[in-house]
Structures are given as structure tokens and as C-alpha cells.
């Protein structure tokens, strides 16, 4: 029997607000344990929460970006459960009345596009963190308590692990473009739980699902879903029954293991939080958030193609990341050459970012300096080969490309006499290859070009070398 995988994702997106969701403590990651805390975080008697307005604005922005219905009136609720790193014994969340509902995210796949529907987006606060790797004891860090989250819940519309990964990547792209989160899975600012089930192809009823946690990369999301789906099929075909439960993904063993029975909503005893007033969103806020929405990747890529004349592929690669697209556009303003700018950004810049594990905002070469380097190439002042040397120097040196070229003596040689003299020496030193070339082995032309460029330390004008060499070889 052939089976179909059914996947829905619950994604927690940590917002990059300065302060927490319900108090004035810093929400920044990486501070010493238990330093970003106050009576509200610690649930001390009499401490009352106050909702951070920025959290509501970010939720509305994400709702607008994903074509959700924005609730004019929504309720904050208490989600009750016990865990050592949850001082209050409940988490402030939303249940019956979320701030956003019924949205859609479009994903691009090799076989075409697909829409994944959203059930809801709701506001939530994060819990603390239990630390188990210090000696034999368990420690609690409550810095993370109260850090604002948005939970994005999809319908079970995905049918393959790759679709789930593509959806998650698109969601990360959206929150990054909006500027509401860095979407860093490794640091936990984007966390994903997958609900997985299988059913016979053609069936309309859903199978029993399991929830998978502890997936900290897109690759692990794919692997975990693939493993869990295969496990379901093996259990069913072996005559067993799938138990609805929560399972942990073990990235070292590449398998899931049982964690606990899957909770239902009634297990959390949700009820409206009496300490917090309803969340009200008016038309003015929606208009203001709409005006603050950025130009999204698809629109920006289309503009790059029409305005700059670069290929659609280049535009698609560059606009994956908002900051990279900003970098490219700033480079074009200086260089005046969009295609050369896209080649450098997609080539040397992205290669360096990957090798050094950098984000573009930490890259040493500003778009203004890269644009200046491209202008030198186009002016014939340096060759592409020399430009790559200058590019490497610029990563360690704050000087402009022009200053580095002058200081290092890297200017391109366009002196016809000097190039002719170098070629003459090359031909005299390689008589055998010269005879072979003139006997019809014309592929040796590249050999002579390489020898000449090597002799002139890469500084010779490539076009002049080609033209002069061809005339001397054919003489």
C-alpha cells in the first residue's frame, strides 16, 4: 500500500523587542543567568503584567504579511502547566481569540508553487530554561521567561519533508524582511514542532499524529519528518497502532524517541488572564503597520529585473535575504553596473560570508567600497584577476580600492610596448608550442595568454594581451 505523509507545523518566533512581553526587563539573548529578571518574571506576589505594545504591532505586521484576518478584539489567556522553569505555573498565551487567523504562506518548490494555510498566529511569552549539563544538578535560568513570542500554526497542508522545510524557510524569510526577528534556529529564536501522520494515498481522513520537538535546523526538520513517517508506516504495516504522543528528535542517532503523551487543549485549562485587558486593534494601527511593511522578496526581485536588467535567477538569489538585497542595491548606486554588482555579490561576497560564517551586516567591505572596486575594473584600471586580490586585501584594510591599488602598485598595464615585449619573450621561450600553434593547434592560444599574464603578474590589460598576441601569432 502507498502512503501519503501529512505534516502541519507549529513555529515559535522569538521577537527582537528591547524589552519582554509583559515587563520592562531586557529581552536580549546571551546575558548572564538570572540577570534579566524582575518580580513579574519571577511571579512574585502582587507583580502585575503590562503588555508590550510593540508585540501587538509585530503580530499585526506578520498577520498582514501572511494575508491573515486581524482580530479587532482578542484575549490573553493563561495556559496552565507545571514545569520547573515556569515560575508562575502558567504561560500567558492566547487560545479562543488569537490576534491573527486564517492566513496563507506561498512556498516555491521545484515542481511549482504551493499555498500553505495558517490556522492562527497568536501572542505568547517564552518559558525559562533548564540546564542539565553542569555537574549532577539541574539549574534554572529565568532570563528567557517573558520574552515575547509569536506562535504560527499551519494547517496540515504539507505532504513531504521538503515542503515542510520550504515553508519554514519562507516563514523565516518573512520575519527577517519584516525586521521582527532574526529567525536564528541555532539560538532558538525560531523553534519548530512538527505534527506528522500518514494515510493511504487517496484517503480523506487523517491518521493519528505524533508531535516532534528538538529540531534546530532545516535539515533536521526534513530528517525528523522523514524518519517519523517511515516509523508510522512500519508500525501500521506491522499490525500496530500509532500512539498520539510527543517525541524528541535525536540528531546524533537520527531517530525520534518518546517524550510524553500528547497533551490536548483541555489539559492546559485555558482561561482569560484576569490581570490583562483585551487586546484592541483599530483601523489606525492596521493602516500604520501596513505602511511599515517592506517590499517583499518577490516584488523586489521583479523590480531588480525590470529596473536593473539583471537575470531573474540573480534577482531571486540576492533577494532571499533583505540585508543582502540592500547591500546589492547600495553597491549598484556606486558602481553604476548592476550585472557586475550582482556577479560580485553572488560570487566573492557570498563565498566569503559562507566561509567565515558571517551575516552581511558584519562583512568588512561596505557596498560603497565594493562599488568603487567595480568602477576601477570598468575603467580599465585593474583586471578582474587583480580585483580579486584587492578584494582580499580590503577585508583586512579599511582603505578604498583605489588607494590599495595605488599603494600596492597593482594598476593595470596598458602600455602596448611593454605588453609586446613580454609576449615576444614568451614566444621565444616556447618555440615548440609556437610551432604547434602555427601548425593548427590553436587551443594553445590560452597557454600563451596565461604565460603572458603570469609574466606581468596579472597586471596586463587582458583585452590588449589577446589582441596583440593574436596579431603576433598570426604574423
From Swiss-Prot:
UniProt-listed InterPro entries: Asn/Gln-tRNA_amidoTrfase_suB/E (IPR017959), Asn/Gln-tRNA_Trfase_suB/E_cat (IPR006075), Asn/Gln_amidotransferase (IPR018027), Asn/Gln_tRNA_amidoTrase-B-like (IPR003789), GatB (IPR004413), GatB_C_1 (IPR042114), GatB_Yqey_C_2 (IPR023168), Gln-tRNA_amidoTrfase_suB_CS (IPR017958)
Entry-linked SMART domains: GatB_Yqey
Gene3D superfamilies named among the record's database cross-references: 1.10.10.410, GatB domain, N-terminal subdomain
Coiled coil: none
Alphabetical UniProt keywords: ATP-binding, Ligase, Nucleotide-binding, Protein biosynthesis
GO MF annotation list: asparaginyl-tRNA synthase (glutamine-hydrolyzing) activity; ATP binding; glutaminyl-tRNA synthase (glutamine-hydrolyzing) activity
Reaction(s) this enzyme catalyzes, per UniProt: L-glutamyl-tRNA(Gln) + L-glutamine + ATP + H2O = L-glutaminyl-tRNA(Gln) + L-glutamate + ADP + phosphate + H(+); L-aspartyl-tRNA(Asn) + L-glutamine + ATP + H2O = L-asparaginyl-tRNA(Asn) + L-glutamate + ADP + phosphate + 2 H(+)
Enzyme class: ligase
Domain of life of the native organism: Bacteria
PROSITE patterns recorded: GATB
Function field: Allows the formation of correctly charged Asn-tRNA(Asn) or Gln-tRNA(Gln) through the transamidation of misacylated Asp-tRNA(Asn) or Glu-tRNA(Gln) in organisms which lack either or both of asparaginyl-tRNA or glutaminyl-tRNA synthetases. The reaction takes place in the presence of glutamine and ATP through an activated phospho-Asp-tRNA(Asn) or phospho-Glu-tRNA(Gln).
Assembly notes: Heterotrimer of A, B and C subunits.
NCBIfam families, per the entry: gatB, PRK05477.1-2, PRK05477.1-4, PRK05477.1-5
Family: Belongs to the GatB/GatE family. GatB subfamily.
Annotated protein name in UniProt: Aspartyl/glutamyl-tRNA(Asn/Gln) amidotransferase subunit B
Biological source species: Chlorobaculum tepidum (strain ATCC 49652 / DSM 12025 / NBRC 103806 / TLS) (Chlorobium tepidum)
